[in-house]
Amino acid sequence: MSRIGKKPVTVPSGVTATVDGQTVKMKGPKGQLQFLVHDDVEVKFENGQVKVAPRAETKRARSLYGTARAQIANLVEGVTKGFEKKLEITGVGYRAAMQGKNLQLALGYSHDVVYQIPEGITIAVPKPTEITITGIDPQRVGQVAAEIRAYRPPEPYKGKGVKYAGEFIFRKEGKKK
């Protein structure tokens, strides 16, 4: 049995939770999110807590209900605090700038890369070498960060490229004569 799944998710004041069949909806100060729970997982909302339990004692149901509980906890955190990812740009001439509703990246290519910011995501550029991505859905925030990083992943020799803040890049030694 999942230890994570056994704990109920407490819904704080200011957040309204509704469970409609297999759909869990959370509405809070930052916005509204919903999550479709797998059929093998049972969801109940009572006394300001969302409780999750497996419908059957199968291995699949036991593994899914811990995941469902974590996803519901992310919904609560998303509509109250939101999620944030930071990226760092390293390299001579590598920089980022906001251009209207788009993110313009100079990453050493012959042209600038223009990234269209999806709905529900906010991108800020406090410095030309830092990008901050915020939103209420952790999956979308992480996906946007991964897409931006994929334009120029950090290389192991000089460490140039786009990396997550705090990410360690394994460095390699160059050729020897």
Curated annotation (Swiss-Prot):
One of its GO terms (cellular component) is cytosolic large ribosomal subunit. SUPFAM superfamilies: Ribosomal protein L6 (SSF56053). GO terms for molecular function: rRNA binding; structural constituent of ribosome. GO terms for biological process: cytoplasmic translation. InterPro entries: Ribosomal_uL6-like (IPR000702), Ribosomal_uL6-like_a/b-dom_sf (IPR036789), Ribosomal_uL6_a/b-dom (IPR020040), Ribosomal_uL6_bac-type (IPR019906), Ribosomal_uL6_CS (IPR002358). Keywords: Ribonucleoprotein, Ribosomal protein, RNA-binding, rRNA-binding. Belongs to the universal ribosomal protein uL6 family. Part of the 50S ribosomal subunit. PANTHER family: 60S/50S RIBOSOMAL PROTEIN L6/L9 (PTHR11655), LARGE RIBOSOMAL SUBUNIT PROTEIN UL6M (PTHR11655:SF14). This protein binds to the 23S rRNA, and is important in its secondary structure. It is located near the subunit interface in the base of the L7/L12 stalk, and near the tRNA binding site of the peptidyltransferase center. NCBIfam families: L6_bact. This is Large ribosomal subunit protein uL6. The gene is rplF.
